[in-house]
């Protein structure tokens, strides 16, 4: 026997038993962004490597360690996309979507990072994101946060997630703070872990995000970014908090919250949970007003967020919120004998037309009554329709209930659609 080929480590199959939960999550995401008037954009999985070096930042873990990069036959350096924002900006610039225009966009699809696989963190993962271009005021920051809060409400997990907020100021304010932070870190350099020492000069704000307990202790006395904000940045953050208070969205200001990507400015945020251990962040984003120009477009304000679907699915499973997932099949149609096969297929087809919401499966491959009923039960259907010689002669269909103790009953062929509509409403 030939050796089986396995999936690549960290790249997982989503099996038929798992896909209904994924479909539920995806449906909630689509309906929620639609309610806010956002439009979908789809971009290629493969992009020029320079796109991510210029957007994410060369001195980041993603670019340095995690990207799937290869050279094609033309000698061009290409990369499987590790996140969705850069591709969305590239597409907006390329197709003239962003010049003097407002755009509210969303995307969903697979991303790739060569990380150590663990629960909630994979090498291929599915990301959902929202991006807004052309609006620089705090009210749009509030809107994307209201939209994210609506997602948790629709998924039934509002009580299990918490919003954390911070502001990174504008580039000049951040540069002044950066110098002050470097000066502080230099005084404690010998006590910093290797990762923080490496980042101290290249990306010092990322040291604030260190998970090392000793580094966190040192940072207790570090200068605060809030002290370096100008009036405009302070007012922007104050207005955002005022709007969130007005609509009842609770949050915690976390002065150490930074983002792992270089392009963020002003507002940054994360939704976190205590239910997933170390993988506590379930959605993250912020404002990135300089990225469009950085990638060759005009100066354009922008704000957005992204979330990993694997982590949301894991959270729903962990919280036991998977019971209301509908079965893959509602009605299973059987044919008891060769003469009844054509009638059974016609019944199934008519039901699909008359009741589009109904999931109807026809038995194929023949077999006796026992085999067909075993398949019907395994399908997850709530009822089986039995069509035998007797039913065929009398213009009837036998309805057998598979998930309760109701007695089976005979229904006239021409009344079957109305009967099932009432039964399944």
Curated annotation (Swiss-Prot):
Enzyme Commission (EC) number: 6.1.1.21
GO biological process, one term: histidyl-tRNA aminoacylation
GO CC, one annotated term: cytoplasm
Compartments (UniProt record): Cytoplasm
SUPFAM superfamilies reported for this sequence: Class II aaRS ABD-related (SSF52954), Class II aaRS and biotin synthetases (SSF55681)
GO molecular function: ATP binding; histidine-tRNA ligase activity
Protein name: Histidine--tRNA ligase
Gene: hisS
């Amino acid at each position: 026997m030939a050796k089986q080929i396995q999936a690549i480590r960290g790249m997982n199959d989503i099996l038929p038993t798992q896909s209904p939960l994924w479909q539920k999550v995806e449906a909630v995401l689509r309906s929620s962004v639609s309610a806010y008037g956002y439009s979908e954009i789809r971009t290629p999985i493969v992009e020029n490597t320079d796109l991510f070096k210029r957007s994410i930042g060369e001195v980041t873990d993603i670019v340095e360690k995690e990207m799937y990069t290869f050279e094609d036959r033309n000698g061009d350096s290409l990369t499987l996309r590790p996140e969705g924002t850069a591709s969305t900006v590239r597409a907006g610039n390329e197709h003239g979507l962003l010049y003097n225009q407002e755009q509210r966009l969303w995307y969903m699809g697979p991303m790739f990072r060569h990380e150590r696989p663990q629960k909630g963190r994979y090498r291929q993962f599915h990301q959902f994101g929202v991006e807004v271009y052309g609006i620089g005021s705090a009210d749009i920051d509030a809107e994307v946060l209201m939209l994210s809060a609506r997602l948790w409400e629709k998924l039934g997990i509002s009580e299990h997630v918490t919003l954390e907020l911070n502001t990174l100021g504008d580039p000049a304010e951040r540069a002044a703070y950066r110098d002050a932070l470097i000066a502080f870190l230099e005084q404690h350099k010998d006590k910093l872990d290797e990762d923080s020492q490496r980042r101290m000069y290249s990306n010092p704000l990322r040291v604030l995000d260190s998970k090392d307990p000793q580094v966190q202790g040192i940072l207790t006395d570090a200068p605060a970014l809030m002290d370096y904000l100008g009036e405009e940045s302070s007012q922007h953050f104050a207005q955002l908090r005022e709007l969130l208070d007005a609509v009842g969205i609770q949050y915690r200001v976390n002065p150490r919250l930074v983002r792992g990507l270089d392009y963020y400015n002003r507002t940054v945020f994360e939704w976190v949970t205590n239910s997933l251990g170390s993988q506590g962040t379930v959605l993250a984003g912020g404002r990135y007003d300089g990225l469009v120009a950085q990638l060759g477009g005009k100066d354009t304000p922008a704000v957005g967020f992204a979330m990993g679907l694997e982590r949301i699915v894991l959270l729903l499973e962990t919280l036991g919120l998977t019971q209301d997932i509908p079965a893959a099949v509602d009605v299973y149609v059987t044919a008891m004998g060769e003469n009844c096969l054509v009638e059974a297929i016609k019944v199934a087809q008519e039901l699909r037309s008359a009741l589009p919401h109904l999931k109807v499966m026809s038995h194929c491959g023949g077999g006796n009554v026992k085999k067909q009923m075993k398949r019907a039960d395994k399908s997850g259907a709530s009822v089986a329709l039995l069509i035998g010689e007797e039913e065929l002669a009398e213009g009837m269909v036998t309805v057998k209930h598979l998930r309760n103790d109701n007695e089976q009953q005979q229904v006239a062929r021409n009344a079957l659609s109305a009967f099932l509509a009432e039964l399944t409403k």
